[in-house]
Amino acid sequence: YGLAADHVLDAR
């Protein structure tokens, strides 16, 4: 649970 969260937060 790190890569997905990172790219998701950035894509928000």
Swiss-Prot record:
Query: Which superkingdom does the taxonomy of this entry point to?
Result: Eukaryota
Q: In its UniProt entry, what is this protein called?
A: Unknown protein 6
Q: Which organism is it from?
A: Daucus carota
Q: What is the lineage of its organism?
A: Eukaryota, Viridiplantae, Streptophyta, Embryophyta, Tracheophyta
